[in-house]
C-alpha cells in the first residue's frame, strides 16, 4: 500500500467518525435562528447589532461569547436537580462510569437495569427491555450531565466533543412528529421536562469547550426553546407529572431569560403550581396520590419552584398560603417517617438513603428556619426539637401513625386506610409497616416495576395484589374499593385506638380496629361484615431475614433474630382459624426483589353473619416467644366497638377497656 493511499484512508476514517458532528455544525446560520431570542435583553447589544446588520455568523459568535462570560460569572445551577451536584467535590465512581460508557454509546436509561449498547450509529428507538420506563427514561439522557461533570473535573475534550455529537444526533433523529410511537416516548411532557431541567447546568459546563461552536449554540438554543415551549402547552392533566412539568418550565424561564417566551414559561409554571397545590394536597398535608415517595417529591417540587422564582424576584407570585401548605406537607412527612428516615413503601414507594433524606430536610430547614421539628430531622436530632406529638392521624389521607417516641429505638406503626388514590395507589387498605428498635419487621411489598408489555405488567400486578399486603381478603381477591371511613381515633397515655371501615368487596365491609397498648404492642381486630360468603384471610408479611417459626398448634408465628429483637403475631380467636404459609416477596428498589416469609389466618364465611379475627402483634426481647391468651369479659361487644377484654401475657393480666 502506498503512503498516499494510506493517508487517504486515514482522512476518510476521520471524516466518517466525525460526520455527525460536522453535519451538525456546518449548516449556515440565518436570521431565523434568532427569532426566539430577545435581542433587547441586557448584555446582547453586540448580538443585536450584528443581527441588524445581517452578520449572522458574527451574531452567533457574540451570543456564544455572552454565554461563556455568563457561565464564568455564575456556577451551574443544580438547584432543581433530583440530586444536586457539587462541582467542587471529586467525581464518584458511578458518575465516571456513566460518562465513560456514554463515550461508546453504552447507556443506562434506568437504575433498575444495567447498561445497554445503543450502537455506533445510536439507535434512539431501541427498546432492549419492554419496560416502558426504559424507553421513556432513555430520553431523559441523564448521562449527559455525568459527561459534563467529568469534563469539568478533567478538562478532557473527548467528553465535550461526544456530547455535542450526541445532542445533535438525538435532536436530528427524534424530531417532534416523527411517528406517534416515537412521540409517545421522546415527547411525553414528563421526559421533555426532565431534559429542560437537566440541560441548563450541562450547557453551562460545556459552553466554554472549543467543541461548542457558534453553529452548535444556535442549534442547541432552538432545540431547547422548542422543548420548553412545547412543555408549556402540554402539561399533564393531573398528578405529580403536572407538578414536575410546571416546576421545570418555570426553571427553563429562569435559566434562559434571553428567550422572548421565558416570561410566559415562568408565569405558566407559577400559575399551574398555585392551582395544583390546592387540588393535590389534603388539609392534613398529604399529597393526594397517597404515595410517600411522591409526597416527598411534591415537597421538593413546590420549594424548588419557589426558589427559582426568588432568583428573579417573583416569589411574591406565590401566596403565603402556598408556603404554609408546603410546611404542613413536611410535618405530614415527619408524622409518617420511621426512625431510620424511611417512609412506608405504600403506593409505588421505595426505600431511601438516610443522608439524602437528611439533606432534603436541611434544604427545607433553610426555608422554614423557625420550625424546630424540621431542624431536628435535618440534624439527626442534634439541633431543634422533636415534634410535640407522638401518635397522629392524617385523617384526610388515611395515614395513621402509632408512635412510642422519636428516638431510634422507638416502636412505630404506620397504617394506611385511605380514600381512592391515583395511578400509584394499590388495593391495600389496612396494610402497615411496623418498626421496632431499629428494625422494620413488616415492610410493605414495594413496587418492583411500573408498566410495559404483558410480561412486565404481570410482574407489576403481582405486587399490587391485596393478599400480599397485611390486610383482609375474600377468596384471595383484590379489594374492589379503597374508600376507608374513619370510625374512631383516640390517643392516650397507655392506649391509642383506630377503627376504620372499608367497603372492600360487594356486600362485604372490612372493619379493622388497632389498639396500641402501653406504647408497646398491638391488638388487631378484623371484622368481615355483610352478606358475602367465601374464604376469609387476614394476611401478614415479614422481613426477608426474619427466619420465623410457624407454630400451627398455637396459631402463631414468631421471628428468631439472634440479637433478641423479635416479634410474634398470633391469632387469639376462640373459633377455628387456620394458619397457612404463603408466597412472599418484597422489592426495596426498582426491578429487584427478595423472597420473604408471609402467612395468613383463614376461616370460612358461610352466611351473612359477621366473622371476627383477633390477632396480637407482640414485640419481645430474647429467644423465647411469650405465652398469650385472651378472655372476653362481660359487656364486651365487638359489633358496637365496646371492648372489655383480659389479655394474659406470660401469666400477667392486662385489662383492655374501650367504652
From Swiss-Prot:
<dbReference type="InterPro" id="IPR031680">
    <property type="entry name" value="Hepar_II_III_N"/>
</dbReference>
<dbReference type="GO" id="GO:0015021">
    <property type="term" value="F:heparin-sulfate lyase activity"/>
</dbReference>
<keyword id="KW-0574">Periplasm</keyword>
<dbReference type="Pfam" id="PF16889">
    <property type="entry name" value="Hepar_II_III_N"/>
</dbReference>
<dbReference type="InterPro" id="IPR008929">
    <property type="entry name" value="Chondroitin_lyas"/>
</dbReference>
<dbReference type="Pfam" id="PF07940">
    <property type="entry name" value="Hepar_II_III_C"/>
</dbReference>
<comment type="similarity">
    <text>Belongs to the polysaccharide lyase 12 family.</text>
</comment>
<dbReference type="InterPro" id="IPR012480">
    <property type="entry name" value="Hepar_II_III_C"/>
</dbReference>
<dbReference type="GO" id="GO:0030200">
    <property type="term" value="P:heparan sulfate proteoglycan catabolic process"/>
</dbReference>
<comment type="function">
    <text>Specifically cleaves heparan sulfate-rich regions of acidic polysaccharides. Does not act on N,O-desulfated glucosamine or N-acetyl-O-sulfated glucosamine linkages. Functions in cleaving metazoan heparan sulfate and providing carbon, nitrogen and sulfate sources for microorganisms.</text>
</comment>
<feature type="active site" description="Proton acceptor">
    <location>
        <position position="294"/>
    </location>
</feature>
<protein>
    <recommendedName>
        <fullName>Heparin-sulfate lyase</fullName>
        <ecNumber>4.2.2.8</ecNumber>
    </recommendedName>
</protein>
<keyword id="KW-0732">Signal</keyword>
<dbReference type="InterPro" id="IPR054646">
    <property type="entry name" value="HepC"/>
</dbReference>
<keyword id="KW-0456">Lyase</keyword>
<dbReference type="GO" id="GO:0042597">
    <property type="term" value="C:periplasmic space"/>
</dbReference>
<feature type="signal peptide">
    <location>
        <begin position="1"/>
        <end position="24"/>
    </location>
</feature>
